[in-house]
Structures are given as structure tokens and as C-alpha cells.
């Protein structure tokens, strides 16, 4: 009588076990950094903020990476800068993300349905570019039911400016082919 989510977790656990049993026999295993993450949650398990936007991410290196836990809000765009930072590489890279090892607040920007969302450790701001923005305090309002943009207009406006600037930079970079230069 397992739920779909429980079956999925059990299968993922089994698959990862089999994968690591196999790769740990390879000579390259101890010098490899593994990133285990998801691209989205199960759609039918989306009942509140956490089940909608929270996905796991595990960075595992058998020989190199000590234990580290971050509760910082991050996104997949932070993976490349995090690895570059961890490996102490001096390189130019094309990424809108930031290393999770930096001593700075994390945030994530994404599109969910018709809404653009900027997420911080404390707030979620939504903007569909047509209606008034909405701001939620995610620690106390996990269902995102209580818009507090009128109570905290400065925070709402600051986050909205950050969101719009981010979207503008991404749009310009893609339109001008500035994301990656081969040489």
C-alpha cells in the first residue's frame, strides 16, 4: 500500500545503491564528484510550498569532499559555480548562478506556469507580468495563501527589481548570443 511517492523514493534508493556498487569498483571512482539531484517534484505531490519547489541535491566525492550541509536557497544554476569554487579552478564560465560556498544569501529564479518566481530563504515573490506582484513569507505560509506585499512593500519592490533585472539579463544574453563564446 505504498504511495506513488514512496515507491519512487524506494526505487531511486535501490537504483542509486546499484549504481554506486558498480562504480566504486572502477579506478576513477575515488577521483569523481557525483551530483545527485532531481529536475522537479512529482506533480501530484505538490500540496504546499515545500513539495512544489523543494528538490534534493547531493554532491558526493568519496575522497575529496568533507561533510557540508547548506540550507541556503539555491538552484541548478548554482552547481557549476559551486564545483568550480570547490575545485579551486581559475576559469571564466557562463553561469547566472553562485557558489553555495560563498558567504551570501542564496536565491533562485524560475518560471512556474504563467508566473515568474524569485525565491529567497525567507520570501517567495511571484510576478506574472500582468497582475500585481505577490509576496509570501515561506517559513510561516507554506501554502502561499497570504500575500504580504502590501505589508512589506520595500521587500516586495526590491525582490521584484531583482527578478526583473535577472529576466532582462537572461533575455539579452540569449538574444545576443552572449551565454557562451567558444573561443
Per-segment meaning from a language model:
Residues 1-183:
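Solvent-exposed soluble domains appended to multi-pass membrane proteins
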Amino acid at each position: 500500500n505504498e504511495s506513488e511517492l514512496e515507491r519512487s523514493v524506494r526505487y531511486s534508493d535501490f537504483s542509486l545503491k546499484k549504481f554506486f556498487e558498480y562504480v566504486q569498483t572502477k579506478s576513477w571512482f575515488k577521483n569523481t564528484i557525483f551530483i545527485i539531484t532531481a529536475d522537479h517534484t512529482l506533480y501530484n505531490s505538490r500540496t504546499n510550498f515545500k513539495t512544489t519547489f523543494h528538490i534534493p541535491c547531493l554532491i558526493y566525492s568519496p575522497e575529496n569532499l568533507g561533510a557540508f550541509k547548506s540550507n541556503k536557497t539555491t538552484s541548478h544554476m548554482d552547481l557549476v559555480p559551486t564545483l568550480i569554487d570547490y575545485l579551486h579552478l581559475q576559469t571564466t564560465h557562463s553561469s547566472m548562478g553562485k557558489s553555495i560556498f560563498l558567504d551570501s544569501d542564496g536565491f533562485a529564479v524560475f518560471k512556474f506556469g504563467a508566473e515568474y518566481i524569485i525565491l529567497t530563504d525567507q520570501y517567495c515573490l511571484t510576478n506574472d507580468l500582468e497582475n500585481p506582484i505577490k509576496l509570501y513569507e515561506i517559513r510561516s505560509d507554506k501554502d502561499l495563501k497570504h500575500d504580504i506585499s502590501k505589508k512589506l512593500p520595500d521587500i516586495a519592490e526590491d525582490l521584484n527589481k531583482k527578478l526583473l533585472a535577472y529576466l532582462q539579463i537572461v533575455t539579452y544574453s540569449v538574444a545576443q548570443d552572449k551565454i557562451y563564446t567558444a573561443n
